[in-house]
């Protein structure tokens, strides 16, 4: 597993620029950063990201990916990175968890709700902290590999539609009973 993965819309709230800066600061010669996503509304922001990354041969922009290509990227990455400032329940984070990936995530409530006791937490909008977490994953992978299993288990217990529907039905039954 030789790369970190960012997957999502390339917009400022999701902070791909902080991730690029942090990855370059981490300076891991044997690792890459794959940026999978696009922004058709603000192409100038994508151009800014490409300019930011142009000094590094280790940062790859794929554009938007779908279906099997998305799965292939998620299956093979060392860690999924979600450095967002503002986020609802991120579908890409749930997808990364369902592939059993370690997740480097900003410590915002939505990410904490999804990951629970898992996750390599970074302070949002803190390039130095994010860089340290990128290095931490590369150098301590064996110590945190348990998170892969935990993330799969958490997805099955909390985010599979059948489970969610059963929990919701139980909740409604309790309300009606009271």
Please state what every model-predicted region is.
Residues 46-68:
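Nucleotide-activated donor-binding/catalytic signature segment of Leloir-type glycosyltransferases, i.e.
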Residues 85:
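Aromatic "clamp/platform" in nucleotide-sugar-dependent glycosyltransferases that forms part
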Residues 64-65, 72-77, 168:
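Short alpha-helical donor nucleotide-sugar binding micro-motif in glycosyltransferases
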Residues 19, 80-81:
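A short hydrophobic beta-strand element within the catalytic core of glycosyltransferases
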Residues 1-14, 19-24, 34:
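Conserved donor-binding/catalytic core segment of Leloir-type glycosyltransferases
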Residues 120-128, 136-141:
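Conserved acidic donor-binding segment of nucleotide-sugar-dependent glycosyltransferases
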Residues 143-158:
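A short, well-ordered alpha-helix in the C-terminal region of glycosyltransferases
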